[in-house]
């Protein structure tokens, strides 16, 4: 168990997409360190299970409905959070995911191939995936940013991906959005550097989540060929576990540990990026 970061106690964290596999683990850990945690999802009900876990363990949390692509929805969520917790100290932009309309069925183009090709992808599906993963972080940062600037040691942590560095096959919209997240993280870090607001990102390696389950796990529960490629390309020879992200999360969230760190994206990937394949 990670030692408690006393500097985080009493502060408020807002987590978009907070009920997801990775972000819910972050929410529980931040609450363990004494932070008040607001879990944002399209419906408040999606976050209630995480809130119950946190409160049962003695922490403080609330579930709030918010659509990260709707500014007014985010504004209402902000007012709700301020009414309950009084401030915002940390924003984690974790909302994201994929959609079948923005995924090709084959890794490389085949003229006579079956299934959805690049030319078959639906524009609306592509834009929805890109917007959810990138524009949602932009809007949430705008809405909560003014409150963050009032805090003593504010921080934004964006969720990136291995696909930001070298785009994964099949998921062009997701890959483009995550590359944009890395760039936007650096832009915001410079823009707000003199205010004390630090902006960084975490790029998880390959973790099993609800969003990628069908790409990585067959119906019979075995690994897909894509999973086998991932494991072969990961020197630690396994998928990541949510708890693998928590040390990096706490380091970036706690100014006493990372007060001079801004504008970086930290890979937590079991060596995936370092491995050349030979």
UniProtKB/Swiss-Prot annotation:
The stated induction of this gene product is: Induced by galacturonate, repressed by glucose.
Q: Which UniProt keywords apply?
A: Oxidoreductase
Entry EC number(s): 1.-.-.-
Gene Ontology molecular-function annotations: oxidoreductase activity, acting on the CH-OH group of donors, NAD or NADP as acceptor
Q: Which family does it belong to?
A: Belongs to the short-chain dehydrogenases/reductases (SDR) family.
> What's the further remark here?
Member of the exu locus which is required for galacturonate utilization.
Q: What is this protein called?
A: Uncharacterized oxidoreductase UxuB
What is the species listed in this Swiss-Prot or TrEMBL entry?
Bacillus subtilis (strain 168)
């Amino acid at each position: 168990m990670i030692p408690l970061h006393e500097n985080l106690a009493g502060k408020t964290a807002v987590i978009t997409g907070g009920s997801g596999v990775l972000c819910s683990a972050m929410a529980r850990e931040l609450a363990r360190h004494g932070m008040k945690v607001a879990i944002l999802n399209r419906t408040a009900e999606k976050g209630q299970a995480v809130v119950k876990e946190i409160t049962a363990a003695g922490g403080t949390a609330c579930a709030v409905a918010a659509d990260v692509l709707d500014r007014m929805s985010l504004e209402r969520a902000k007012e709700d959070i301020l009414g309950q917790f009084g401030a915002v100290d940390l924003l984690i932009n974790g909302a994201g995911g994929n959609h079948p309309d923005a995924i090709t069925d084959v890794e490389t183009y085949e003229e006579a191939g079956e299934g959805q090709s690049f030319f078959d992808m639906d524009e609306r599906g592509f834009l929805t995936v890109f917007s959810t993963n990138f524009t949602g972080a932009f809007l949430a940062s705008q809405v909560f940013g003014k409150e963050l600037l009032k805090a003593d040691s504010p921080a934004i942590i964006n969720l990136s991906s291995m696909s930001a560095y070298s785009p994964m096959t099949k998921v062009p919209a997701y890959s483009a959005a995550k590359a944009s997240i890395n760039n936007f993280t650096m832009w915001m870090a410079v823009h707000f550097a003199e205010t004390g607001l630090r902006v960084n990102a975490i790029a998880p390696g390959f973790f099993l989540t609800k969003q990628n389950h069908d790409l990585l796990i067959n119906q019979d529960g075995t690994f897909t060929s894509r999973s086998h490629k991932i494991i072969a390309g990961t020197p630690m020879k396994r998928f990541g576990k949510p708890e693998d992200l928590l040390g990096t999360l706490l380091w970036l969230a706690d100014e006493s540990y990372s007060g001079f760190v801004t504008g970086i994206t930290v890979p937590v990937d079991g060596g995936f990026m370092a491995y050349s394949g030979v």
